[in-house]
Amino acid sequence: MSNSIHFSLIAIFLLLAVCSDVLAAEPASVVAPIPNVLVLGDSIYSQSTNNAASILRGRVNLKFATMQPGEVRNTHNALENLNDLLGDERWDLIHFNFGLGDLVYRAPNMKTFRVLPKTAGGIRTTSPALYEKNLRALVTRLKATGSKLIWASTTPIRHSSTGVFDMASEIEYNAIAARVMMEHGIPVNDMYSHVLKLIDMEKPAAHGADPFYFDRKPLYPPIVLSVLRQLDLIRPVRGPVQVFIMAGGWSHIGGGIVIDSVQPRPGQNRGTLDHLVLEGKNAVEYRHLLDQGGKWKTRSDVWIHFDRRGPKSGALGIGYGGDRKRCIGSELSFGITLGEHIEKQVCIIKTALGTPSLVSDLRSPSVGGHGQQPGTAYTNLLKQINESLDSLSDKFPDYTDDAGFEIAGFVLNVGEQDGDSDLYGEHLKALIADLRTDLKTPQLPFIIVGTGRGGRDDTEFPSIIQAQQQVVSLPEHQGNVAFVETRDFWPNKDARDAYRHPSNERWFDNAESFYLMGKAIGDQMIKLLP
């Protein structure tokens, strides 16, 4: 071996040794573990915990201590079964409430718990003095776990059709609990005040145990907010939050199939999002939908709210289509596109209007004769928008009034229920003007999504599409209204095999069609933004 080769090898070995030391000295990136939070309470917290867990996914692992069918949880059985309720897991935070089960009237002198009306000889499960004693014992044992604690006040009790509750009896017990928690330095999640603002306390009882029903009003927002605050996980957003509103019929709602709501499942049919990201011919273009672990990704810089068959809010991801667990519509790629281009926090309000006709259901105020009322869907649209904007902090716990919001864009996907193109054009022009007035945004960027169902060979909607394009081309709409062509996204192969697929009204539930549609909408919206 020559000297030059010998010295070269020595140099290489020395270089590798130095690099190894440098690499070894480089600190490994530490990923903070996701905190575990347990919710203890009666049955009203079961669904609320599920809702809250959906919003907190990726930030907090939230679990409800499950109950047996027919179980009425109160301070007595909570003390008796506390070890089982806590389980073997280490909890960073415990959110707890017991109250309704203590206030209910029960049959006396029975080993098994049975609800019995006061008028039939029932006795209140727990006296005020015993309630305080039990609470103090519970707090002592819960504090011994080393977990942080949050107490939730008991929700309001209104009329009970079966006489098993006394209206407003929770007020005394909430005062007792507040005193105990203050002595122990335990923060209180004021569920009582939250619910009191939402429900009609004078409404006659509609159920046997009316205090367990809340007129479909969401209970989860204060749970989410109190958990994040106690764990110091509130993330201030860059405002004002840019709000984009989406409205329309089935093509807007979307039915793009996702087989597995957690992680794409291999070997699925063409047209599913699972197939698209794993095995489709352009799969590499869709891999950004997955996180490093191969699960469906969410993005916290884009929020979304959709209220169809129940409200759902959170970080943008799958599950905001027609099936709230396993579907997508155009909102997914629309939001992704916006998030990639807008530095401020983005929020999508996806409205649910059924399958409206623009000319009748969405008729706006300035159309028609004097005194004619707007269409039902138009009124409902404004109601959904305003209710969503008024409760942004409930839906998105990182939102603050200091950040504020501004309505930044509107997407309309309506036309499949309309046949008269002349009337359609007239109503569309009026709708744009009226919505801008009602939303107090005179130059609101507006996207008209072309009625592309049926593709290029369709003979039903060309006149509607022409009317849409004519409205977009009006001088007053230049630079602030745009048209999105969707016929090229029609799944022709699914249409040819229609006997194997769902209705064409839902675009054969083809996920790629909805994804491409949303991407095109997003691209056009970006061009309209200042």
Q: Which residue ranges define each predicted feature?
A:
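Short, solvent-exposed loop/turn and secondary-structure capping segments
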Residues: N50-N51, R106-N109, S161-T162, I253-R265, ...
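Catalytic His-Asp segment of secreted/periplasmic serine-dependent ester chemistry enzymes
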Residues: T154-R235, G452-L529
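Extracytoplasmic, non-cytosolic globular domains
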Residues: S388, F396, T400, G409, ...
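Bacterial N-terminal signal peptides
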Residues: S8-D21
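Active-site segments of SGNH/GDSL-like serine hydrolases
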Residues: N97-G101, M110, R136-I171, V359, ...
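Conserved SGNH/GDSL esterase-like catalytic core that processes O-acyl groups on lipids
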Residues: A24-K133, L228, G267-Y399, G404-F405, ...
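Structural recognition of the beta-strand scaffold that forms the well-ordered cores
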Residues: N36-V39, L62-T66, D92-N97, L149-S153, ...
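N-terminal module-boundary/linker segments of secreted carbohydrate-active enzymes
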Residues: V237-N269
